[in-house]
Amino acid sequence: MDIRAAEISAILKDQIKNFGKEAEVSEVGQVLSVGDGIARVYGLDNVQAGEMVEFPGGIRGMALNLEVDNVGVVIFGADRDIKEGDTVKRTGAIVEVPVGPGLLGRVVDALGNPIDGKGPIQATERRRVDVKAPGIIPRKSVHEPMSTGLKAIDALIPIGRGQRELIIGDRQTGKTAIILDTFLNQKPLNDGDDESQKLYCIYVAVGQKRSTVAQFVKVLEERGALEYSIVVAATASDPAPMQFLAPFAGCAMGEYFRDNGKHAVIAYDDLSKQAVAYRQMSLLLRRPPGREAYPGDVFYLHSRLLERAAKMNDDNGSGSLTALPVIETQANDVSAYIPTNVISITDGQIFLETNLFFQGVRPAVNVGLSVSRVGSAAQVKAMKQVAGSIKGELAQYREMAAFAQFGSDLDAATQRLLNRGARLTELLKQPQFSPLKTEEQVVVIFAGVNGYLDALALRDVGRFEQGLLTHMRSEGKEILDAIRVEKALSDDLRAKLKAEIDAYAKNFS
């Protein structure tokens, strides 16, 4: 028997090299059945609920149903590449996404992967998507304004930082337009140096057309608003688990800012589609259906998401996360299951109506049905002073307008009320992409409630407003600055403002 020394030394070297190496142990299971984006897996005995698992080819999934003999896994991707008998690996990690300032200006999917072709994400850390909302002690009452730049909202339904304000209405009533204007309105704050005033924007698109999302991103980019925004997109062609996960992923990204003493606003567009995706997953996982075939925990799905929007107290960095959930109603039915759920969770709602939209009242806000339950505490004092009477006047106007259809001989007081109401309604109209600063809104509404529009023809109201703003930006600049700094209308400032509007109104023709 010949001894080959070279071979023996090679074997020994190999053995020495591998000495002390741990064998990699990973718990694996087998796919029992797969279909409709759901895989039944046998053998993952110690898997956690919500844990990420991996299929061959790098496809990821999430364990949702932990049953006696198998695990129900929802698949984040196409299930056509997964077949019966495939091995499934545990990752040991609950679903998490990258967070941090590196995501600003980017478009990502529900797992935080970039989909905008601008290279990898520079994330500072990763966070779990589904975490517990802050308790009662670390919170603080909402007290800072979150300006949308829309007169109808900032005057009548003010939103504060840390509030949850629902935007609800039928399709094509301008729900996304309100979100877009709100994002664009934050540009002056984000361009400034005051870090405590900056408001980062996160837009979560659930179940929308890709063209719609692309259009939204294009507008943000053209107007220089994408640099302080994050877009999380789970479009209509994405699997239901991605649409279910996207709002939670966006929320985790927003919580990074909230927990670091910064401010963020997140818009979920829209939660009706998330509920539909969740219903699809639940029914395929054979969970028992409830009202309208939604699962029993669909209320908890939305409440645990929206409770994460909060205003933190000073000990916790005094950051905030404001939520603007969107719900699409069918034929103005706000008493359906999902709309009533979300109305009861949020701190108020902005109700948009189709017939107002087609009458040319845009934003199509129904002032009677819309409320803000905590926003008035956050409203700027100057706005409170001028807008206090407008809500009452509009309510009276709507009531009278209904009766006025039947009678032609109305007394002078009623005529005056109808006249003023029509002009105030006209004044609250606003074209898209033209948000106004708070001090400019104060001036315009001041002119409206103090009778400067009463003598004008309805068609001239918009022209009067534009002219007044142009005049104030040049001639009355110090008055605008004073309103911005003082945040209130003192008697002296009120007199100056009155004189300035008088001077403009005299020359208006």
Swiss-Prot record:
CDD domains: ATP-synt_F1_alpha_C, ATP-synt_F1_alpha_N, F1-ATPase_alpha_CD. It comes from Chelativorans sp. (strain BNC1). The gene is atpA. Transmembrane segments: none annotated. PROSITE patterns: ATPASE_ALPHA_BETA (PS00152). Produces ATP from ADP in the presence of a proton gradient across the membrane. The alpha chain is a regulatory subunit. It is found in: Cell inner membrane. Keywords: ATP synthesis, ATP-binding, Cell inner membrane, Cell membrane, CF(1), Hydrogen ion transport, Ion transport, Membrane, Nucleotide-binding, Translocase, Transport. The record marks 370 as: Required for activity. One of its GO terms (cellular component) is plasma membrane. Belongs to the ATPase alpha/beta chains family. GO terms for molecular function: ADP binding; ATP binding; proton-transporting ATP synthase activity, rotational mechanism. It is a peripheral membrane protein. This is ATP synthase subunit alpha. It is an enzyme of class 7 (translocase). It comes from the Bacteria. InterPro entries: ATP_synth_asu-like_sf, ATP_synth_asu_C, ATP_synth_asu_C_sf, ATP_synth_F1_a_nt-bd_dom, ATP_synth_F1_asu, ATPase_a/bsu_AS, ATPase_F1/V1/A1_a/bsu_N, ATPase_F1/V1/A1_a/bsu_N_sf. F-type ATPases have 2 components, CF(1) - the catalytic core - and CF(0) - the membrane proton channel. CF(1) has five subunits: alpha(3), beta(3), gamma(1), delta(1), epsilon(1). CF(0) has three main subunits: a(1), b(2) and c(9-12). The alpha and beta chains form an alternating ring which encloses part of the gamma chain. CF(1) is attached to CF(0) by a central stalk formed by the gamma and epsilon chains, while a peripheral stalk is formed by the delta and b chains.
